């Protein structure tokens, strides 16, 4: 039986102490186009050959027995020149133990040029192997043909390039591996990060040439040298497809078709960016420009001569105009994170516009070189026609590629050419790199020295010193030097960005703008180099034992080994903020990590285990950091894939380049390395907590077909055969209606954290749907392997298990706790308000004939409102009636204490009710009664598919917008509250807060309004009325068997509180109903954060009803808290503030946590006893006072 249990996998890493002589692996480059994957041993060089054939396994075994027994190791770099769909990856199986001996797959690492890995094998053996594609769901797709067979020489370093399905291919001659101490980690993310040092290319005599970053990314045609002017227009085979294009995309594709050379293409980009005025159009222009320029700089969109004659100064002038516009866009107050992110990707694709390149005749050195008399005539002609004439007529990126190819050629053999000639050509090469902004980070930083003040120079010199020590240390695993270099880089980048943030004046001289471009490129280059440093650090961390060793250190209460990883993460998150992405969030995460780093792991925190509290607190922040990286990646996935596909198809870009574009952007960014570090640290934290990555929201057991969906949206779920299904859901916002989406849903597995007591959690519990979340990447991958299969989900507080089920698909029962409608909750039975309970007869919506509305104006009291103390179910709804009862209970609570002396006292905000019938009266006064009745009739049968239901809901909402709350009603409300009071307008429908239909969060609440602004107040009430007819509300009532005509809405108006904390209490633990615990979930600020299912976790406390013992179950990590501004307008809106939990008492003060937990437990137990059943309670903490704003029956 295939199973995903609750166990954790052990790490394959071996721990080595910091003082060990072992060093981090060093990365090397095989050729100028291939970057290699993770290395784990020191390199050796050789010139031996490799051959590849196909043979049978029996022959392989015979040959393996004959291998050389000398023990000499061979370094083999393998690249599979093949790309796969986003989310899939490539692995290999093989006969050698280093790749799993056919039992385990060995993953390859992604690069733009294919999938790569490095193996260290015993020399002399015969290696048999084969590639597989590992799908996103975990399934394997093997390449066809016989097993590949490779005869491994006795010693040396080699590389091979393979192609998918070509198992009998003749491999290219092996290339010797040259050393490059300047490259970071395993190479698979290194393609776009040749910024740390100059890219080194070996020549026959061992000389090293400094190559440009442009050359390292080139995917266009190789340089072709000519001895006459044969350039012409060689643009053959390209196709442009403008069908279906419009707007910016159409303009860009037509512009490319009419622009053969580089300067015309740059001018077209300038026109597109400058000509985009509207925000949406502007973002599109930036996105398409970034994609287009990237393809030009990598040679996938070629540039040719078109018969014109424009020196490079023309390109420089256009570049300056583009640069100014980008800086202007990003400096605007309303600049979006998306615009800033995309603009940063355009900068490295622009040429320099320094004074020497805007001169009338720039780059003249090549003319002098081409006319020297100390070089052969043929070489002179090749330089003249291939480089000089082309550069001065129609410069393009291909000129730098040709120059580097020529430089490598003339330096291959020492003494073959004049030393002065070679030296001058090298100088020209550096000038050309400078023009294309393709120099190394060191060269870029050197070029800006002249403009730096003493503080800047000090930061720059410190960075150079740290970098030099790191590069010459000879040990890539020198963690201390890595951390020092990271700190110095951060300091330097901060200095640069501070200067850049001063802005660009409209009257800034050209020289200042040119230097500003250098500063901008340097800070982008520093971010790229941090990617390299963080990658090296991750390798070092793995070498030292990785997550397993970190977890062991926590177990032994020695957490000093966590200091460097947390430092690295803080610095990495700081770099993301410096790049303009969620700066306040990055700052808060950094503050928290530093605070937790400084806190000792205590034996006890209050009455709780210090190790557990330390780990849970850190886990909350690590989850927050990983959420930051996920949101960044999600943004890239929203921005690029559809636009890359549109532009790529129209421009005839190879499908492989289109398919891998976004993955390359994600993997080449610092956010990718931060995500990897978070994954390692979270694994260590989970191991130390004994956690398995599961969180049980609703326990139980169920079976069904596992179906993967993006979200729970009615009408959008895939069709099934009619049997029970278990949903594997990528995202949720907490307001979803599960049964309304599909009546066959038996279970939900959500791949993000979610408050247990969110509206979604409450609804799932009421509907008896087993609900779990999972945040462990390894388990998620295993789960996806079972998509489409009939499985059994078992969830309890102690474990979660997902297994292939032996039960047949014919089984139609939804779960072991079959969903049933509580008939009694909708039955009729008279009771008075003081004995209000879940079985009230008034809790059932009243019935009405098809020709009349449920309530009439004669039901409305004088003045249009009812005092909260007088509210009852028939006139005001269950919520208002419960709040009225709460007000009377609040007085009694002041005299009640728990057995341990903890007070059960609480307060209730003052309030009034706009009763049932008020909406109908407003409809009548607006002459909209008949139109509304007609739409309501259509609503009963409207189909959710095809937009029919949405259209009718929209029409009803338009009717509601035209309504007005009577002036006498607003005047009455004004008299009931203080003059400057802020109010909240809440729903109190006859179809919510019932035992069989809690409708938690289904209807609107509008905060921060005041009757002193009648227009805003009236509009807020109408929004609450309209929320009765949203798509979700209609489908929810259908699922419960309630007619749309039977639904009506009263409005509860209460004093708006400004809480420090908001909470939801369940007086019976949802995860463990027999535990005699009150469970609380707490969020900073207003309670909407909890109720709506905002991404993140709340503080979670459990308090014993009898013993008063408080357990901390989780720490909060919501990114924002919602507040009501006391000085701003009463406009129905919140203020959002970023939360720093290192400053929140509930996180850092164990005594306060204990006291609050006991207080909430006492209040919850008091309410449960007085209401006579388990309660779902909402409230908040204002100063030292507990306020209760709502209590309703808790679904069990």
Curated annotation (Swiss-Prot):
PROSITE patterns: CBM20 (PS51166). It is found in: Plastid, Chloroplast. One of its GO terms (biological process) is starch catabolic process. Its cofactor is Mg(2+). Pfam families: CBM_20 (PF00686), GWD1_pHisD (PF22973), PPDK_N (PF01326). It catalyses: [(1->4)-6-phospho-alpha-D-glucosyl](n) + n ATP + n H2O = [(1->4)-3,6-bisphospho-alpha-D-glucosyl](n) + n AMP + n phosphate + 2n H(+). Induction: Circadian regulation. Induced during light phase and repressed during dark phase. Residues 185-200 have a biased composition (Basic and acidic residues). Its main location: plastid. The active site is at 759 (tele-phosphohistidine intermediate). One of its GO terms (cellular component) is chloroplast. In all starch containing tissues (e.g. roots, leaves, stems, inflorescence and siliques). Keywords: Acetylation, ATP-binding, Carbohydrate metabolism, Chloroplast, Kinase, Magnesium, Metal-binding, Nucleotide-binding, Plastid, Transferase, Transit peptide. Residues 1-54 form a transit peptide. Required for starch degradation, suggesting that the phosphate content of starch regulates its degradability. Belongs to the PEP-utilizing enzyme family. The N-terminal domain contains the alpha-glucan binding site, the central domain the pyrophosphate/phosphate carrier histidine, and the C-terminal domain the ATP binding site. Homodimer. The reaction takes place in three steps, mediated by a phosphocarrier histidine residue located on the surface of the central domain. The two first partial reactions are catalyzed at an active site located on the C-terminal domain, and the third partial reaction is catalyzed at an active site located on the N-terminal domain. For catalytic turnover, the central domain swivels from the concave surface of the C-terminal domain to that of the N-terminal domain. This is Phosphoglucan, water dikinase, chloroplastic. It comes from Arabidopsis thaliana. The lineage of its organism: Eukaryota, Viridiplantae, Streptophyta, Embryophyta, Tracheophyta. The gene is GWD3.
């Amino acid at each position: 039986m295939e199973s995903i249990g609750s166990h954790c996998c052990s790490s394959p890493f071996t721990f080595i102490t910091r003082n060990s002589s072992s060093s981090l692996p060093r990365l090397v480059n095989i050729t100028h186009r291939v970057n290699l994957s993770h290395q784990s041993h020191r390199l050796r060089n050789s010139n031996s050959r490799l051959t590849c054939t196909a043979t049978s396994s029996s022959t392989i075994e015979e040959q393996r027995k004959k291998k050389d027994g000398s023990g000499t190791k061979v370094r083999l770099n393998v690249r599979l020149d093949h790309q796969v769909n986003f989310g899939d990856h490539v692995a290999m199986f093989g006969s050698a133990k280093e790749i799993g001996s056919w039992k385990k797959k060995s993953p390859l690492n992604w690069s733009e040029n294919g999938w790569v890995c490095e193996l260290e094998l015993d020399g002399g053996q015969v290696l048999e192997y084969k590639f597989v594609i590992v799908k996103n769901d975990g399934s394997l797709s093997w390449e066809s043909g016989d097993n590949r067979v490779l005869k491994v020489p006795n010693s040396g370093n080699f590389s091979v390039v393979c192609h998918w399905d070509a198992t009998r291919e003749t491999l290219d001659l092996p290339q010797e591996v040259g050393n490059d101490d300047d490259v970071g980690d395993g190479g698979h993310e290194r393609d776009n990060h040749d910024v740390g040092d100059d890219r080194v290319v070996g020549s026959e005599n061992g000389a090293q040439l400094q190559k440009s970053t442009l050359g390292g990314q080139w995917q266009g045609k190789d340089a072709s040298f000519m001895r006459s002017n044969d350039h012409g227009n060689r643009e053959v085979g390209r196709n442009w497809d403008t069908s279906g294009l419009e707007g910016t995309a159409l303009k860009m594709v037509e512009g490319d078709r009419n622009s053969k050379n580089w300067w015309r293409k740059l001018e077209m980009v300038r026109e597109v960016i400058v000509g985009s005025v509207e925000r949406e159009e502007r973002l599109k222009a930036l996105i398409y420009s970034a994609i287009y320029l990237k393809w030009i700089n990598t040679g996938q969109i070629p540039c040719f001569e078109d018969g014109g004659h424009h020196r490079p100064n023309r390109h420089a002038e256009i570049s300056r105009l583009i640069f100014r516009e980008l800086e202007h866009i990003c400096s605007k107050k309303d600049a979006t994170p998306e615009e800033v992110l995309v603009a940063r990707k355009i900068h490295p694709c622009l040429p320099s516009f320094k004074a020497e390149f805007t001169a009338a005749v720039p780059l003249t050195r090549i003319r002098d070189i081409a006319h020297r008399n100390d070089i052969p005539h043929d070489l002179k002609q090749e330089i003249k026609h291939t480089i000089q004439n082309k550069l001065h007529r129609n410069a393009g990126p291909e000129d730098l590629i040709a120059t580097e190819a020529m430089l490598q050629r003339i330096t291959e053999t020492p003494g073959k050419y004049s030393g002065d000639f070679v030296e001058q050509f090298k100088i020209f090469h550096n000038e050309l790199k400078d023009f294309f902004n393709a120099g190394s980070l060191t060269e870029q930083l050197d070029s800006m020295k002249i403009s730096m003040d003493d503080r800047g120079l000090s930061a720059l010199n410190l960075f150079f010193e740290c970098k030099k020590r790191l590069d010459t240390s000879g040990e890539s695993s020198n963690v201390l030097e890595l951390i020092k270099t990271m700190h110095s880089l951060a300091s330097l980048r901060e200095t640069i960005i501070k200067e850049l943030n001063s802005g660009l004046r409209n009257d800034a001289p050209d020289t200042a703008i040119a230097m500003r471009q250098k500063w901008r490129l340097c800070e982008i280059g520093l971010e790229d180099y941090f990617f390299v440093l963080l990658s090296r650090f991750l390798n070092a961390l793995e070498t030292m034992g990785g997550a397993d060793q970190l977890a062991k250190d926590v177990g032994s209460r020695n957490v000093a080994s966590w200091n460097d990883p947390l430092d690295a993460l803080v610095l990495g998150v700081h770099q993301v903020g410096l790049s303009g992405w969620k700066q306040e969030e990055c700052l808060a995460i950094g503050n928290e990590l530093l605070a937790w780093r400084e806190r000792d792991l205590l034996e006890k925190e209050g009455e709780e285990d210090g190790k557990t509290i330390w780990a849970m607190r850190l886990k909350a922040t690590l989850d927050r950091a990983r959420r930051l990286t996920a949101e960044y990646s999600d943004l890239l996935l929203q921005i690029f894939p559809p636009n890359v596909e549109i532009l790529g198809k129209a421009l005839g870009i190879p499908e492989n380049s289109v398919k891998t574009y976004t993955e390359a952007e994600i993997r080449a960014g610092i956010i990718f390395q931060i995500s990897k570090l978070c994954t390692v640290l979270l694994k260590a934290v989970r191991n130390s907590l004994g956690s398995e990555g599961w969180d049980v929201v609703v326990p139980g057991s169920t079976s069904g077909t596992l179906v993967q969906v993006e979200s729970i949206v009615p009408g959008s779920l895939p069709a099934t055969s009619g049997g029970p299904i278990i949903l594997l859901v990528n995202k949720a916002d907490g307001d979803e209606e599960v049964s309304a989406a599909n009546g066959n849903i038996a279970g939900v597995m959500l791949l993000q954290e979610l408050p247990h007591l969110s509206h979604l959690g409450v609804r799932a519990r009421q509907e008896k749907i087993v609900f779990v979340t999972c945040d462990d990447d390894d388990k998620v991958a295993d789960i996806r392997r079972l998509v489409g299969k009939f499985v059994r989900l078992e969830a309890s507080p102690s474990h979660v298990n997902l297994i292939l089920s032996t039960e047949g698909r014919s089984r139609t029962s939804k779960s072991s706790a079959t969903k049933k409608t509580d008939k009694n909750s909708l039955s009729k039975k008279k009771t008075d308000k003081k004995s209000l309970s879940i079985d009230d007869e008034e809790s059932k919506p009243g019935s009405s004939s098809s020709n009349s509305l449920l309530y009439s104006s004669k039901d409305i009291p004088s003045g249009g409102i009812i005092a909260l103390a007088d509210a009852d179910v028939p006139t005001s709804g269950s919520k208002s009636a419960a709040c009225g009862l709460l007000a009377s209970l609040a007085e009694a609570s002041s005299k009640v204490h728990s057995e341990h002396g903890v007070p059960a006292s609480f307060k209730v905000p003052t309030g009034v009710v706009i009763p049932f019938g008020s909406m109908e009266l407003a409809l009548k006064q607006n002459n909209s009664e008949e139109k509304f009745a007609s739409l309501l009739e259509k609503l009963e049968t409207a189909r959710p598919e095809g937009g029919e239901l949405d259209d009718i809901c929209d029409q009803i909402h338009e009717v509601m917008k035209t309504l007005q709350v009577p002036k006498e009603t607003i005047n009455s409300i004004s008299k009931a509250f203080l003059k400057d009071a802020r109010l909240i307008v809440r729903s109190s429908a006859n179809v919510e807060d019932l035992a069989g239909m809690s409708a938690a969060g289904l209807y609107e609440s509008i905060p921060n309004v005041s009757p002193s602004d009648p227009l805003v107040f009236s509009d807020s009430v109408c929004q609450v009325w309209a929320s009765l007819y949203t798509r979700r509300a209609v489908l929810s009532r259908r699922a419960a068997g309630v007619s749309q005509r039977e639904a009506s809405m009263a409005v509860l108006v209460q004093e708006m509180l400004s809480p420090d904390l908001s909470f939801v209490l369940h007086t019976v633990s949802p995860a463990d109903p027999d535990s005699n615990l009150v469970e609380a979930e707490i969020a900073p600020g207003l309670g909407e954060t909890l109720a709506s299912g905002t991404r993140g976790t709340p503080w979670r406390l459990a308090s014993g009803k009898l013993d008063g013992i408080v357990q901390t179950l989780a720490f909060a990590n919501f990114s924002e808290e919602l507040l009501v501004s006391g000085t701003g307008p009463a406009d129905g809106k919140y203020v959002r503030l970023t939360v720093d939990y290192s400053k929140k008492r509930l996180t850092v003060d164990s005594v306060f946590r204990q006291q609050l937990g006991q207080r909430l437990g006492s209040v919850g137990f008091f309410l449960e006893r007085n209401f006579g059943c388990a309660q779902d309670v909402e409230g908040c903490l204002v100063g030292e006072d507990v306020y209760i704003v709502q209590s309703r029956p808790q679904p069990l």
